[in-house]
């Protein structure tokens, strides 16, 4: 009789040696924080975390399923890690994250190498899934930092009872009743300052998730079903976590959430994000406190003024606009249009003269006509945005847009994506050239991946991992420099997305 697989499995007998657990974390920084929480839970209960899958007794793949390419990468990675059960020492393969919320039964049925699954709302179940007994933590701090930057880079590059509360019978954007294996409950897990984390980022920076879930009705998105309703962490909890991180040597904190500009609304806070930024900027040890993912109509005057007035808050905003044509935005259930966005951008730049603006657009959304796309191109020319990402529309079953007609052919979607990226490349090149001769603080990230003769870093204009780099070539071999140090530099060269600088 074949063995029946459950979403949480336990070992019959405990092992005397600590189990080595390897993690592969895919997707966005929000997913990375989930991985850090699961690693923290494992580490404080006796497991040893490794970045080398070939050395692991247990392998965990934390998946993304936001778009088709992310789903495919997740499946490919699961299959790759499954090979370690056949050829290496790995005894158990656990799949976690968004893919589990969407395809729980299918994963267990079609990938027999998978021993357990852990959804986004049940991170604490990673202990039972790994066969590790909970024990009282003896650590004074809930944070552990991986021993080396290279180890954290390897981690990110790919190597019971559900704690979700009472069942919710939601319709519309929260409906999960037709999902394969999805439980009736929406995820409602939210970590706090006492939750252990193993930081997978370099020791000088960290992400803090200030909220989870999303209430926006965007028709192309299934995040509300994957992550649940929007819910903010307590103000004091975020501050306590930031203070503890700063005492451990973290210099740059990035606040993240599906929509950080909604932070605190569910707690009754007005301008919650602005208040939080103001408070965190008072932490002496921190160099920068930035945030990502601002919803366009949630940006307040106080938030803009807070960014403008505080030197510790980078003059940088990531505001995903998704499109500029009113017709497309209406079908996306986003509202507004290009003229409104241009006025908003004008106001942002008036209050914050040196603002660096990042946004993202979706091309090929159902019903996007050639005229709509041309409007988007004209908007990009007019807005002169600093950093821009372009995504090809991905038809996601479960999203409202899945049922829309007037689908754009894949070849046409790709043509539009390339055209818009080509247009933005010229804008980016011009904006980078305008920086030559200007001086900036640069936080060092380490020797360049291209050559040991160069060091690479970021200015406040560069968010971690998503924007360009600053290359510095005048460090003497004998100089004792370390990642995380900040140097004043002058920009000497500009390329399409990257800069070259010299020390001052």
From Swiss-Prot:
It is found in: Cytoplasm. Keywords: 4Fe-4S, Cytoplasm, Iron, Iron-sulfur, Metal-binding, S-adenosyl-L-methionine, Transferase. SUPFAM superfamilies: Radical SAM enzymes. Residues 19-135 form the MTTase N-terminal domain. SMART domains: Elp3. The keyword tRNA-binding does not apply. InterPro entries: Elp3/MiaA/NifB-like_rSAM, Methylthiotransferase, Methylthiotransferase_CS, Methylthiotransferase_N, Methylthiotransferase_N_sf, NA-bd_OB-fold, Ribosomal_uS12_MeSTrfase_RimO, rSAM. One of its GO terms (biological process) is tRNA modification. GO terms for cellular component: cytosol. [4Fe-4S] cluster 2 binds at residues 214, 218, 221. Residues 200-430 form the Radical SAM core domain. This is Ribosomal protein uS12 methylthiotransferase RimO. It comes from Koribacter versatilis (strain Ellin345). The lineage of its organism: Bacteria, Pseudomonadati, Acidobacteriota, Terriglobia, Terriglobales. The gene is rimO.
């Amino acid at each position: 009789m074949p063995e029946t697989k459950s979403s949480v499995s336990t070992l019959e007998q405990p092992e005397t040696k600590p189990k080595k657990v390897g993690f592969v974390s895919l997707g966005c920084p929000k997913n990375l924080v989930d991985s850090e929480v699961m690693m923290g839970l494992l580490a404080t209960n006796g497991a040893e975390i490794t970045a080398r899958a070939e050395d692991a007794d247990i392998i965990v793949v934390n998946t993304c399923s936001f778009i088709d390419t992310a789903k495919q990468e997740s499946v490919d990675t699961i299959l790759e890690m499954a090979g370690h059960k056949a050829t290496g020492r790995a005894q158990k393969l656990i799949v976690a994250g968004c893919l589990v919320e969407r395809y729980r039964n299918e994963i267990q049925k079609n990938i027999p190498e998978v021993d357990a699954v852990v959804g986004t709302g049940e991170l604490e179940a990673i202990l039972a899934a790994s066969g590790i007994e909970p024990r009282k933590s003896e650590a004074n701090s809930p944070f552990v930092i991986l021993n080396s930057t290279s180890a954290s880079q390897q981690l990110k590059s790919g190597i019971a009872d559900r704690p979700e509360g009472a069942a919710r019978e939601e319709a519309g954007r929260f409906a999960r009743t037709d999902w394969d294996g999805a439980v009736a409950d929406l995820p409602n897990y939210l970590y706090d300052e006492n939750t252990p984390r193993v930081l997978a980022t370099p020791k000088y920076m960290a992400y803090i998730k200030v909220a989870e879930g999303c209430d926006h009705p965007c028709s192309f998105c299934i995040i509300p079903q994957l992550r649940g309703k929007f819910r903010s962490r307590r103000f004091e909890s975020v501050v306590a976590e930031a203070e503890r991180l700063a005492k451990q040597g973290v210099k740059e904190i990035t606040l993240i959430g599906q929509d950080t500009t909604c932070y605190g609304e569910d707690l009754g806070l007005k301008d919650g994000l602005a208040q939080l930024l103001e408070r965190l900027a008072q932490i002496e040890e921190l160099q920068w406190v930035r945030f990502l993912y601002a919803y366009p109509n949630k940006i307040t005057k106080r938030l803009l003024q807070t960014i403008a007035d505080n030197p510790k808050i980078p003059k940088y905003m990531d505001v995903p606009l998704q499109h500029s044509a009113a017709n497309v935005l209406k079908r996306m259930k986003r509202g507004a249009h290009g003229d409104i966005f241009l006025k908003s951008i004008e106001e942002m730049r008036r209050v914050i003269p040196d603002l660096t603006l990042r946004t993202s657009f979706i091309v090929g959304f159902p019903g996007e006509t050639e005229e709509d796309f041309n409007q988007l191109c004209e908007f990009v020319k007019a807005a002169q945005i600093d950093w821009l990402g372009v995504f090809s529309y991905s038809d996601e079953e479960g999203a409202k847009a899945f049922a829309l007609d007037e689908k754009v052919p894949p070849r046409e979607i790709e043509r539009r994506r390339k055209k818009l990226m080509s247009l933005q490349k010229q804008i980016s090149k011009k904006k980078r050239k305008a920086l030559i001769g200007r001086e900036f603080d640069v936080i060092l990230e380490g020797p360049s991946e291209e050559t040991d003769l160069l060091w690479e870093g970021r200015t406040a204009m560069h968010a971690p991992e998503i924007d360009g780099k600053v290359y510095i070539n005048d460090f003497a071999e004998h100089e004792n420099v370390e990642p995380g140090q900040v140097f004043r530099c002058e920009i000497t060269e500009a390329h399409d997305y990257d800069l070259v600088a010299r020390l001052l």
